[in-house]
Amino acid sequence: MAKVAKRIKNIRKDVDFNQLYALNDAVSMVKERAVAKFDETIEISMNLGVDPRHADQMVRGVAHLPNGTGRNIRVAVFARGDKAEEAKAAGADIVGAEDLFESINGGVIDFDRCIATPDMMPLVGRLGKILGPRSLMPNPKVGTVTLDVAGAVKASKGGAVEFRVEKAGIVHAGIGKASFGVEKIVENIKAFASAVIKAKPQGAKGEYIKRVAVSSTMGVGVKVDPATVRSESV
């Protein structure tokens, strides 16, 4: 316990939890304090001025991170025939139809993202109670119900990150690893923030991005000046 307390004290040292830091400074501070024995994930959390209980204030979309996430994303694809072959050629980890349905229905979910061709959705829809709560249900709004399965697979493998606002008006995502350079993490954060801004619903009133914080898996959260996460900021 003493070692844990000392580690927590060290990572909290010199962090003013009441201050809003510029994005670059916040990322540097988080990286410096990511001292676990594994490559910690760098995460962003954004508090939005929306009430997702109202349909016209739902925020959902996909962000394409220019430097990837640092994770090996396993992709499952529901497709038949030529589309199934395209998915395999693009690097999909699992490709199937009724066989994939039976596997998932039986509790085997060993993938991080699920893609389907439109004709497969009547079958996939029956898995809603399993895939929905895990945010794995294919959806045309985020490009996971598509005829371009090859493009969707490559995007998923290359750094596409889905986001969806939670009940408290928060969106969050892993946007890189502590081993990434500060510049790469900043680029990823700005790409994520840009996608969230573009997804602003018509029903949102007043200030949209209210609070932003950056953290690592085992580290502290550092508050960020929201103005510095916009793509045009430096």
Swiss-Prot record:
One of its GO terms (molecular function) is structural constituent of ribosome. GO terms for biological process: regulation of translation; translation. Disulfide bonds: none annotated. GO terms for cellular component: cytosolic large ribosomal subunit. Keywords: Repressor, Ribonucleoprotein, Ribosomal protein, RNA-binding, rRNA-binding, Translation regulation, tRNA-binding. SUPFAM superfamilies: Ribosomal protein L1. It comes from the Bacteria. The keyword Acetylation does not apply. Binds directly to 23S rRNA. The L1 stalk is quite mobile in the ribosome, and is involved in E site tRNA release. Part of the 50S ribosomal subunit. Belongs to the universal ribosomal protein uL1 family. PANTHER family: 54S RIBOSOMAL PROTEIN L1, MITOCHONDRIAL, LARGE RIBOSOMAL SUBUNIT PROTEIN UL1M. This is Large ribosomal subunit protein uL1. It comes from Bartonella tribocorum (strain CIP 105476 / IBS 506).
